[in-house]
Curated annotation (Swiss-Prot):
PANTHER family, sorted: 1-PHOSPHOFRUCTOKINASE, 1-PHOSPHOFRUCTOKINASE-RELATED
GO BP, sorted A to Z: D-tagatose 6-phosphate catabolic process; lactose catabolic process via tagatose-6-phosphate
Gene: lacC
Origin superkingdom: Bacteria
Entry protein name: Tagatose-6-phosphate kinase
Pathway: Carbohydrate metabolism; D-tagatose 6-phosphate degradation; D-glyceraldehyde 3-phosphate and glycerone phosphate from D-tagatose 6-phosphate: step 1/2
Length: 309
């Protein structure tokens, strides 16, 4: 079983408009509301792939109830209730553009943070892999992911971390390391304080930096150019075919789903990397975030090339 953690979920609201007019009324006919957050995208893709998934995070108010009630029944909902209202994130789709309005989310109390920590420990009993995705809610310290990873490691669970900024830096500088991190080039550049390119020799060198010591897998997204990965002392380039992209939103989360599935099933390096990239590509071919059409899985799987470099 795979446990997905979304500490700062949201209701994602989509407002499609022919034209966004400022300082006046804009009427929307076709409104879409879905449970949002990186970890919930991971949950949905794992569920569609056929994995057993348990989803947790911090939710509150009517919007928190909406998230719980609108996840597929086959996803085990194990969310922790807080006093604040779960945030709403609005995407206005207009004239080929996407304007986003993102709420910060609720402020968690010390008691709520401690309560979730105990809740997390309890949920580990029957899982093999834990995914930790997205931003931390207000009130949580930057090193909170580090705390959850330490608990997971002590219980013999594999962890996949997909976050950025201070939360990622705190984990890299901490004592307890995740099994996998999945930065993109921009996030890698931010961590290292220098601009990184798709040059394989340069990537090889930086991924051996002491900053990444103790992390078994480092999987760097190169966007449409695939992936550069390090597993222990072996490096891989994953070459992916060109596809028609409908929406790339959520493709990174779908890739995390593939990584988690590969770890849960003890797959070899090539199988794990191939599965992860196929699920990311399948999501990019769909309008709905966190959704994959499994009918196209085998064809794409055969087109992925994983090379040791």
């Amino acid at each position: 079983m795979i446990l997905t953690v979304t500490l700062n979920p949201a209701i994602d609201v989509s407002y499609p408009l022919d034209e966004l007019k400022c300082d006046t009324v804009n009427r929307v006919v076709d409104v879409t509301k879905t449970p949002g957050g990186k970890g919930l995208n991971v949950s949905r893709v794992l569920n569609e792939f056929g994995e057993t998934v348990k989803a947790t995070g911090c939710v509150g108010g009517e919007s928190g109830d909406f998230i719980i009630n609108h996840l597929p029944d086959s996803i085990l909902s194990r969310f922790y209730k807080i006093s604040g209202d779960t945030r709403t994130c609005i995407a206005i789709l207009h004239e080929g553009n996407q304007t986003e309005i993102l709420e910060k989310g609720p402020m968690l109390s010390v008691d709520e943070i401690d309560g979730f920590t105990h809740h997390f420990k309890y949920l580990l009993n029957d899982v093999d892999v834990v995914t930790l995705s997205g931003s931390l809610p207000a009130g949580m310290p930057d090193d909170y992911y580090q705390k959850l990873i330490k608990i997971a490691n002590l219980n013999g669970k594999k962890t996949v971390l997909d976050c950025s900024g201070n939360a990622l830096e705190a984990v890299l500088k901490g004592d307890s390391k995740p099994t996998v991190i999945k930065p993109n080039l921009e996030e890698l550049s931010q961590l290292l304080g220098k601009e990184m390119t798709k040059d394989f020799d340069a990537l090889k060198e930086v991924l051996q930096d002491e900053l990444f010591d103790g992390i078994e897998w480092i999987i760097v997204s190169l966007g449409a150019d695939g992936v550069f990965a390090k597993h222990k002392d072996t490096f891989y380039n994953v070459d992916i075919p060109k596809i028609k992209i409908v929406s790339a939103v959520g493709s990174g989360d779908s890739t995390v789903a593939g990584i988690a599935s590969g770890l849960a099933n003890d797959e070899d390096d090539r199988a794990l990397l191939t599965k992860a990239n196929v699920l990311g590509m399948l999501n990019a071919q769909e309008k709905t975030t966190g959704h994959v059409n499994m009918a196209n899985y085998d064809k794409l799987y055969q087109s992925i090339k994983v090379k040791e470099v």
